[in-house]
């Protein structure tokens, strides 16, 4: 039998890495500290628990980089994408999932695999021998982070990440709010009505911004300094950047028509997305926050339609850690100072559930191939996975390295016409090229 692969962390990346390696015939020991050791953000001991939102973002694999990443992971028979499909919720053109059954099914599949053993323990030190993948995510334990600092001599970088609140659907006033996906996107009626929309006129919007700016915020610990990831900014931080920022961000009113008052154009719109299959819970889209709990309920109840809302969960903020991967990792995602250890997921400086799982998929395949005596190069940079791994292992500037979502700016340029129509053609050219390159890489 092949040597064993140890994986630390059973989040998106660790779960996918374990599945890929085991499917290649390599025995896996999956180390997960939860539920024995908890974190600020996690509620359960389930694997692949979704703590920020329940969305894998756009599922458009022809003109969207994250949708292309979905396609590549499906082509590679990824467990995360398979389970996401099994627990998919209507969300217009996005891929949203029922988060608890999703995590339960990922956990069950991994625990049932004959080549995967699960050990519920905290790994506090970087091991000096054996084959390891560290996929501890943004909430890496302080002991392991300290071990990493001691080995590399480098400070782990950090940024703050916020979580959006969840509302009980039955407490939303549907005489004010209405159901509609932006631009009526979706092939079914469920998809076209996947979001609940709460309209604001100008006076309501201005009062909301005033309250948001004045609300009491969570204070950070003394000496704790870090930036925010731009893709997950707290709404009050966005409001501080300008009073109109939210109107052009998560509260933009475009592509929506109030079914109660079709002739009336909203000045701003707050959207809520279904958070579970039953449709009993909705999260407020883009409303991650660091306001204190009392302030949250007061401010969010100013939203028309949410005056009597009850919250299943309020928002919160936590500190994320990630490596300066361009300095520390090679192109096989191995730690240069200790090549028996690979890193995967958000700890490497990718941002997002899908990106994390994709890096887990690659790390799992690369580690398994190495154990089996083969060398597996990363996918070409023309692919979504290849573009991401190239970025984190050397494509990014080490001095200014920050967490990154997948986007077409990471891909080698392609010649195409300019303008709006040209941009759509260019994105399609990116995805066509990527699919061909990824298919060839998979078959090699």
From Swiss-Prot:
This is Methylenetetrahydrofolate--tRNA-(uracil-5-)-methyltransferase TrmFO. Belongs to the MnmG family. TrmFO subfamily. It comes from the Bacteria. InterPro entries: FAD/NAD-bd_sf, MnmG-rel, MnmG-rel_CS, MnmG_N, TrmFO. One of its GO terms (biological process) is tRNA wobble uridine modification. Its EC number is 2.1.1.74. It catalyses: uridine(54) in tRNA + (6R)-5,10-methylene-5,6,7,8-tetrahydrofolate + NADH + H(+) = 5-methyluridine(54) in tRNA + (6S)-5,6,7,8-tetrahydrofolate + NAD(+); uridine(54) in tRNA + (6R)-5,10-methylene-5,6,7,8-tetrahydrofolate + NADPH + H(+) = 5-methyluridine(54) in tRNA + (6S)-5,6,7,8-tetrahydrofolate + NADP(+). Keywords: Cytoplasm, FAD, Flavoprotein, Methyltransferase, NAD, NADP, Transferase, tRNA processing. Pfam families: GIDA. The keyword Transmembrane does not apply. GO terms for cellular component: cytosol. Transmembrane segments: none annotated. Catalyzes the folate-dependent formation of 5-methyl-uridine at position 54 (M-5-U54) in all tRNAs. The keyword Transferase applies. It is found in: Cytoplasm. Its cofactor is FAD. The lineage of its organism: Bacteria, Pseudomonadati, Pseudomonadota, Alphaproteobacteria, Rhodobacterales. FAD binds at residues 9-14. GO terms for molecular function: flavin adenine dinucleotide binding; tRNA (uracil(54)-C5)-methyltransferase activity, 5,10-methylenetetrahydrofolate-dependent.
